[in-house]
Amino acid sequence: PATGQDLVLRVNTGSQMHLPDQIAYEFAALTDLLPTGRTPRPLFYDDSRAILPYGALVMTWLPGRHLRYEEDMGAAAEILADIHALPVPENTRLLRPDRPAGSIYQECLDMAGRYLAWEGADKTACRLLEALIQEVGRLPLGDPSPAPPAIVSTQLNSGNFLINPGERSYLVDWEKPLVSEPAQDLGHFLAPTTTFWKTDVILSPANIGDFLRRYATAVGGRFDLRSLAERLPLYFTVTCLRGVSWCAMAAVEYAQPGRVLTNADTQVKLGQYLSEDFLEHILETYVRRDFLRGVAL
């Protein structure tokens, strides 16, 4: 622009939430989140599709590098605490699932189902996906939560954090925000299917316990954390299923001719996540046993 200000133009080619006005939804989310000081400022959006065949959003550019799990967990805890402490605006248009964990599980069934019905699916991957679906389906996915509502990102891989050591850090890529409970974000952030996506890191129980203590300190009593110990293991486990189910769906999409967007690194990760070794590891380590047992705030 004439001002010389660095801006970001986001062009949306589809909606993972199946919304007819995806770019307007993202604009609304960023508007709600503005008081946190942790997200881009939305400037305007155009969903007319008069010039481009897609919706477009302009927002401020923010500095920072991607999160490093080995050294940036304190910064991540502070970012998430500030976002989760934001009172949900009464007039928010963000979706609010009645039973968020159950909604995630249903999404997993839909995504994995596409792979299970695909003629190119690997038989071993299908067997293990079906086992994961069956085991996770036994969890109390429909239980109501006593946790206070919060705006959650639902997309907390390391590449969506902008870290500035010693200065303010940020969270970007607000494509799929919801009104839910903080445990949903924390379960997603800490799950191996998230940390391993852009890095080779899988967090230990000690790593997770240290992060949760930092998060509680950063929250500083701004909202009630008493239900977190009960709700976090549920979201942690269902997120593991969601991670591999998403990869299964993406493998089908990447195999389609004429796909608009592709990424070589993503294709490599899809193969890793759908391998027998990785799926077995998720099933035995994170689903068939309580990986977070003994981890406390």
Predicted regions and their residues:
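Active-site activation/catalytic loop segments of kinase-like enzymes and analogous catalytic loops
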Residues: L186-F223, T237-P257
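Conserved protein kinase catalytic core
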Residues: Q16, A50, H66, F161, ...
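ATP/Mg2+ or Mg2+-diphosphate-binding catalytic cores
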Residues: R127, G243-L297
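Acidic, serine/threonine- and proline-rich low-complexity regulatory regions
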Residues: R222-L234
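Short, flexible, mixed-charge acidic loops at enzyme active sites
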Residues: R49-V58, Q184-L186, A251-Y254
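Active-site acidic catalytic loop and adjacent metal/ATP-binding pocket
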Residues: P1-G4, V8-L9, P42, V136-Q184
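ATP-binding pocket architecture of kinase catalytic cores
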Residues: P1-Q106, D110, W118-G120, P146
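An alpha-helical support segment within catalytic cores of ATP-dependent transferases
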Residues: V88-T154, N164-G166, F223-D224, T285-G294
